[in-house]
Design a protein with these regions (language model features):
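A polyanion-binding, active-site-adjacent surface
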Residues: 1-129, 133-136, 141, 147-150, ...
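Charged phosphate-binding loop/patch that engages nucleotide di/tri-phosphates or the phosphate backbone
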Residues: 178-182
Length: 182
């Protein structure tokens, strides 16, 4: 069976955004399951992909509406990761063309440990939790220095139920700025 992302990319979220650098954690579910899309960062696709996935289009739309950012012409979010945004999925692999096919096979324990390590950081961090699966992690997030932002998932199925207009990006910026983090 073909598995995505390629083996060398599975842990990219942690490589690109080491624990000491995390300012924001955006929690996704599982990787994109078509070829040449997933590369280890939630919501992100490789720069060679001409099509920006619908959820990411909606994230860009909210970013534009909230902060006036220009909508990029690709879906490659490595720049976010390099700036301290941990783009973590709760499950890190998927069988080709089968969404959620690797749920319940052990990745959740691993990614929960990452979430717990972020929760233990004694500095301000923002969590953006979009959709119920991401929000199911809230009981693990006990650090009073951290900001938890919740909204429906940016998928076209739920974006109009409150993802659009959630203003998470400006709230995160204000919180980090207030705490002296650029």
């Amino acid at each position: 069976a073909v598995i995505y992302p390629p083996a060398d990319d599975i842990f990219n979220a942690m490589h690109f955004t080491p624990l000491s650098q995390v300012k924001v954690l955006i929690l996704g579910q599982d990787p994109y399951h078509n070829e040449n899309q997933a590369h280890g960062l939630s919501f992100s696709v490789l720069p060679s992909q001409k099509d920006i996935p619908p959820s990411l289009q909606n994230i860009y739309q909210e970013l534009h509406d909230d902060l006036g950012c220009k909508v990029p012409n690709n879906g490659y979010l490595k720049k976010w990761a390099d700036q301290g945004v941990l783009l973590l999925n709760t499950v890190l692999t998927v069988r080709a063309h089968q969404a959620n096919s690797h749920q319940g096979h052990g990745w959740e324990q691993f990614t929960d440990a990452i979430i717990e390590a972020v929760n233990a950081q004694d500095r301000p961090i923002v969590y953006m939790l979009w959709g119920r699966p991401a929000q199911s992690k809230i009981p693990m997030l006990t650090n009073p220095k951290h900001l938890i932002l919740k909204a429906p998932h940016p998928s076209p199925l739920s974006a109009y139920r409150g993802f659009f207009g959630c203003r998470h990006f400006s709230q995160a910026n204000e919180f980090l700025k207030k705490n002296g983090i650029e």
